[in-house]
A protein has these predicted regions:
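N-terminal cysteine/histidine-rich coordination modules
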Residues: 1-76
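Alpha-helical interaction/linker modules in multidomain eukaryotic proteins
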Residues: 3-14, 99, 108-125
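Exposed alpha-helical structural elements
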Residues: 6, 86-89, 93, 135-138
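General structural signal for secondary-structure boundaries
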Residues: 15-18, 41, 80-86, 129
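Polybasic, low-complexity binding patches
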Residues: 61-102
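Charge-rich, solvent-exposed alpha-helical interaction surfaces
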Residues: 90-93, 97, 112-119, 139-142, ...
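Charged, low-complexity interaction regions
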Residues: 102-107, 151-152
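C-terminal, charged low-complexity interaction regions
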Residues: 123-220
Length: 220
């Protein structure tokens, strides 16, 4: 598994299902994501980070922090000691474990899913969730808690604002470049359990697809 990316980087790439290398959802062949390292069916995207191979739709958001719905899909966190690839692995494993506990039906399950994601983002109580969800919820809460430090350092947790600021920065100035490099060494992107294709959140369906390909428990 080629999972070498330690920090969040600007690797702009619009999310385009018709782009070379992209696959349609539901395609039966499996691949190992070059970023999170997890077995994935269907849609894949070329990886412009370290290491060869395609990435899953979740990890692909690292490559375009200015996507139209990015503020609903991810937030910035501060965790220098935890590689970005590890964050993606932990997040996707927690999401799969949570979906596995909720069941495998696309209707009422999505409502519960979104309530759980909202509770994690807002710090609300999740006591009504099944006990089997506790481990996954604890991981997601611990990751989201690092938004506090990101906000203290950046005065924002919005990926688009950071990406815009970095793209506009005069990196030819040694001091600015050093500050930006130090910042990027510690900033990470944390997915919020949503992924939009236009107005539609397709992420719950993607998680179910991943579970169908690998139904074994992914977190205990």
């Amino acid at each position: 598994m080629a999972r070498l990316t330690q920090s969040f980087r600007l690797l702009p790439r619009p999310w385009d299902p018709s782009a070379p290398g992209a696959r349609e959802m539901g395609e039966p062949d499996l691949f190992t994501c070059a970023c999170c390292g997890l077995i994935t069916p269907g849609r894949r995207f070329p990886w412009h980070g370290d290491g060869p191979g395609p990435v899953c739709a979740l990890c692909n958001i690292l490559q375009d922090p200015t996507r139209p719905a990015i503020e609903r899909e991810a937030v910035l966190i501060w965790w220098p000691k935890l590689p970005q690839t590890r964050i993606m692995t932990l997040t996707r494993c927690a999401h799969q474990a949570l979906m596995q506990t909720l069941g495998n039906g696309p209707n009422g399950q999505d409502v519960v899913w979104h309530r759980a994601m909202d509770a994690i983002a807002s710090g609300s109580d999740t006591a009504m969730m099944p006990a089997q969800c506790k481990s996954a919820l604890a991981v997601l809460r611990a990751l989201h808690a690092r938004t506090t430090e990101a906000r203290r350092r950046l005065e924002t947790t919005f990926p688009r604002l950071l990406a815009t600021a970095l793209l506009m920065a005069n990196r030819a100035d040694p001091q600015i470049n050093e500050s930006a490099t130090t910042l990027m060494d510690g900033i990470r992107l944390f997915p919020l359990g949503r992924l939009y294709n236009g107005p539609t959140d397709i992420y719950p369906a993607l998680v179910r697809e991943w579970l169908d390909a690998d139904p074994q428990p992914v977190m205990t």
